[in-house]
């Protein structure tokens, strides 16, 4: 018997099959092989066709079943992970009324700022833990203000994962975690933030039915089965946005645990047992997958735009003949602190953790008689690592007591200089685990159905690929970090 998981990204869709008995991975597939198109009719806009996501889900499902020579009737349930903060609106026929406004669309920034003040900044922080920002609710208000003929035809609005569940089941359902990422969940009252919707002029009846992240959220109907190739009647047991789901995939579920990502941009996702926040201008707080009224589990999300993109820029523009492994090895030949060379890696747009500062990247203390290319490689890796540590200090100030750090098997966390710098400065070992969001979603669905006692059991077959231990000698790392942070503070003042 198997469980299937989907990860609905903006670049591609992934699907995975896991064995029901122990959570082992049977297969993982991705489609399309080239990135899905994102339509940008104006600067700052980003839209995708939700039906295209569904078409790729159907293609992947049939491919998984055929290539692995299994019976579709052996698939027992479904889990869904999806790109966060997107907006899909459907009419009474349950078809999209317009393209989805996805996560990287920035058209609603001003709307969110205005709502934050009209609804009351203190009330927003106390109840929804965030400013409405540029998230799902603000995007819906944009439609109301700019496309009233479409808004007036809306039957339900939803997140990308909710739409895929709708296509499978014919039911409009969402989750508290999903509503929290759209800044519509009242943590203080453990309910939909009706007061915020009313202030925004949004009819609460447009919200889909609300069910827990781990629960029966619908069953594959006849049409969903016919189009996808799945058996009719199997349950959708789980859904969550990609960052909470990434943490779940790494079995990051309890206060103090951190899931880190070091891709083009960097993410630190920390679990907290507290509902309050002191840092709402620099981090976002959402309901984690296992959050309940009587069990506070808040995912505190800190993003760093200028991470892997900086390292890839150095590779492509300065040393294209070297591989990343060769760059990493060269960096290891340079002492901690890069002989004084410092790089601030903030060259990929406004950085929320720096309160939306957008001054660009900086190289400091470059000495033509001392510094070689290897120094640049190390200073780049250290600068990114220092940014992560700086972000973790913000999380600590927001009540997170770090107990463990886990990361997926991506390029930056395979770089010894990068990972050991973080491990040493936080005094936390970093475990690198090979997994994917689609696998995590499949396991979470099986867990929700009672096939596993907890997510630790569901992920027990995952092997730790690599462990980065703190260096026994902390002083040079701390000195280098303190010097870098002083440079950062001067950079922010000027």
What are the roles of these predicted feature ranges?
Residues 23, 49, 78, 105, ...:
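Residue-level signal for inorganic ion chemistry
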Residues 1-98, 110, 153, 208, ...:
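N-terminal glycine/serine-rich phosphate-binding loop of ATP-dependent small-molecule kinases
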Residues 206, 212, 243:
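Extracytoplasmic ligand-binding clamshell segments of periplasmic binding protein
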Residues 33, 82, 104, 214, ...:
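Residues that line or immediately flank small-molecule/substrate-binding pockets and catalytic motifs
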Residues 45, 53-54, 103, 142, ...:
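Signature tryptophan residues that serve as conserved aromatic anchors
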Residues 44, 66-103, 129-134, 165-186, ...:
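Short beta-strand-loop/turn "lid" adjacent to the catalytic site in phosphate-handling enzymes
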